[in-house]
Amino acid sequence: MTAKAQVKLYTRPGCHLCEEAKREILAANCSQDYVLEEINVETDPALVEHYGWEIPVIIINGIKAFKYRVTAAEFRSKLKRLSRS
């Protein structure tokens, strides 16, 4: 059995692009292949310093995969590519 990919979605409250990104991730219909962790950058000053307003950011298995916008098809494709061992 292959381990699930680790997906981190860096967001902040009131961010409409963040909401869109999460919708697209969920619309990709491949949730069986990953574990999603949504992280509010405002909870950690270091994250605010690092990301500022440049969110959403999607990290797959430790690799920055997307910034700002993503489609369900793009997410599925990159998840598959970055999940290969």
Please tell me what each predicted stretch does:
Residues 34-45:
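Thiol-based oxidoreductase modules, predominantly thioredoxin-like and allied folds used
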Residues 23-35, 52:
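Conserved segment of the thioredoxin-like fold in thiol-based oxidoreductases
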Residues 43-56:
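Short Fe-S-cluster ligation motifs
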Residues 63-85:
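Non-catalytic, surface beta->alpha helical segment in thiol-disulfide oxidoreductase systems
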Residues 2-27:
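Local sequence-structure signature of Cys/Sec-based thiol-disulfide redox active-site neighborhoods
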Residues 56-64:
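A short, hydrophobic beta-strand/beta-hairpin element that forms part of a small beta-sheet core
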Residues 20-23, 50-53, 70:
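Generic recognition of short, well-ordered alpha-helical segments
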